[in-house]
Design a protein with these regions (language model features):
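Domain-level signature for soluble enzymes in the chorismate/prephenate branch of the shikimate pathway
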Residues: 1-392
């Protein structure tokens, strides 16, 4: 009996060793594929070709799924795996092109954002500017207006502000500040927000008060509806909430992320505070005179327009995008200060102002608008997954 167990134990160890060796070969193959993709990206840049080739992605994906099917592998598994591989290739090629076109010599960037250590803005800013600059020097602000002002006064190289959330929608304070700014958009970053209740306590039953930024509290309404015994209090930033949870009484907690709890040495008391598990905040980077984005990169363009009061004027202004096959990813209306019942419209579209179809659509927009102001074209960090050919 003992000999049989020993034999099976040796067999398991042998199989695990073989799996480890196979995993190592897989990783080395992925590294080699990445190197090839980067070399291809350099050739594309030299030829002035777009980074993304959707038709080529379909060919790669269809072939991989077909090969997997022949070997008895699940189609959905292969499709998901190669979508991740293609996404990595695109991001590496984009980073390479971004480095080629950037002329800035800053080793570190001064970035104005809301809050401080432990805030979602800090983690998102660090992620966005990583690889672009050797360090991010925070210029901490207590409100959104301070972010814009710091950049306009030259106290920061960039502003970094949340502009919309998948749960609560557009952040109107930021849209209202965009109405009157001379700043341009220099990039965007989609950050996954996972709200937790964090503090010195180990059990939610000992918590009496929970602090958080108003947006975080708004995105956790269902959690607090389930716990009416908790008193909630809005503060100016997640950092303020974390500091009070750290230095205050043990019955005080904060709404923050896991990384913030780790940074402050606090416990994650409850990890289910978010109303929705797929909760993302889109941040925009703002600058006085940002580096121009290459039209070869996946880009977005943002504008604000005012149309006349005539019936159908907005439809006419936007019709060029339909005609030219340009996707509008955002249309947000805001009132015009001092002009009751009149609206301005903020637009985000996929594409660069220099793309011919975008340029033609913008001509139609200008023709049917009272005013048009562009915040510029900038690299988009959101890539739609590669898709197989229709019907496959």
């Amino acid at each position: 009996m003992t000999d049989a167990r020993d034999s099976r134990s040796e067999e398991r160890a042998s199989l695990r060793s073989a799996i480890d060796q196979t995993d190592a070969r897989l990783v080395r193959t992925l590294v080699e594929r990445r190197r090839l993709a980067e070399a291809l990206g350099a050739l594309k840049a030299g030829d002035g070709a777009l980074v993304r080739d959707v038709e080529r992605e379909r060919v790669v994906l269809d072939r991989a799924v077909a090969l997997g099917r022949e070997e008895g592998l699940d189609e959905a598994f292969i499709e998901k795996l190669f979508q991740l591989i293609i996404d990595d290739s695109l991001r590496r090629q984009r980073a390479g092109l971004d480095a080629r076109v950037r002329t800035a010599t800053l080793n570190e960037a001064r970035v104005a954002y809301l809050g401080g250590p432990g805030s979602y803005s800090q983690f998102a800013a660090d992620a966005h500017f990583a690889g672009r600059y050797s360090a991010v020097m925070p210029v901490i602000q207590r409100d959104f207006g301070g972010i814009f002002e710091a950049v306009e006064k030259g106290e920061a190289d960039y502003g970094f502000a949340p502009i919309e959330n998948t749960t609560t929608g557009g952040i109107v304070e930021v849209y209202d500040l965009l109405r009157d700014t001379r700043l341009k958009m220099a990039g965007e970053h989609h950050y996954k927000v996972e709200h937790c209740i964090v503090g010195k306590a180990h059990d939610l039953g000992t918590v009496r008060t929970v602090l958080g930024h108003p947006q975080a509290l708004r995105q956790s309404q269902r959690f607090f509806a389930r716990h009416p015994e908790l008193k909630i209090r809005a503060v100016s930033s997640s950092t303020e909430a974390l500091n009070e949870a750290l230095t205050g009484k043990p019955d005080i907690a904060a709404v923050a992320g896991r990384d913030a709890a780790r940074l402050f040495g606090l416990n994650v008391i409850d990890a289910s505070a978010s109303d929705h598990p797929e909760n993302y905040t889109r941040f925009v980077a703002l600058a006085v005179d940002p580096e121009p984005a290459s039209p070869l990169l996946p880009c977005k363009t943002s504008l604000v327009i005012v149309t006349s009061d005539a019936a159908g004027s907005l439809v006419s202004a936007l019709d060029g995008f339909r005609q030219e096959g340009v996707s509008l990813t955002k249309l947000e209306s805001r009132p015009i200060a001092g002009k009751p019942w009149q609206q301005m419209f903020f637009l985000d579209l996929d594409g660069h102002e220099e793309h011919p179809n975008v340029a033609r659509a913008l001509q139609v927009l200008h023709r049917h608008s009272v005013s048009v102001h562009s915040f510029g074209s900038y690299g988009s960090d959101r890539l739609e997954p590669a898709a197989r050919a229709t019907g496959k």
